Amino acid sequence: MPQINIRPAVAADIPLLVELDHDYVTDYVWQMDVQRPEEGQINIGFRQVRLPRSARVEYPRPVRALRENWQSRSGLLVARLQDQVVGYISLSKEIAPLTTWVTDLAIMRRVRRQGIAGALIFAAQEWAQASNTHRLVLDMQPKNYPAICLALKLGFDLCGYNDQIGERRVGKECRL
């Protein structure tokens, strides 16, 4: 496989990043089960559920906002493969103290499942350590089965689940 080059984003990258296909297709979702076996006890479990058919899931945030706010993000790293921009990872240190959050991770559809997302996450870990943060959190939808599998493969642990009206979010973290 050709070498993946990862570097900070520059202005010329932004139109290319906005045009990446940010949505994804999934055959599974993670479903949360809540049980109350007795007073004062709550058991929460997650189980993988196969969907009756593949589902295309839209990206949860407006991608076009990247054009206006890319310079205000804590970090924005770009992956290049054979001199072509093929993905990016957006980082924020403003959400929680001593923590870097991955708020966006997008890979060009035709080069997915080739290690590019993993390389960007490893680069984000290095960036987070250099920025004196102690945790890296991946923020994702519970429908994003491919991203959840990648996070588990890379050794991330579940650190939260947000079931607010409108958008469910799953957090996976690793200690740096």
Residue ranges and their predicted role:
Residues 11, 19-99, 103, 108-110, ...:
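Acetyl-CoA-dependent GNAT
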Residues 120, 144-147:
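Conserved short alpha-helix immediately C-terminal to the canonical SAM/SAH-binding motif I
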Residues 111, 115:
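Glycine-rich phosphate-binding loop
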Residues 137-140, 152-169:
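Conserved catalytic-core motifs of GNAT/GCN5-like acyltransferases
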Residues 171-176:
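Positively charged, low-complexity/disordered segments
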Residues 128-140:
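Conserved GNAT acetyl-CoA-binding A-motif
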Residues 2-5:
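Extreme N-terminal starter segment of soluble prokaryotic enzymes
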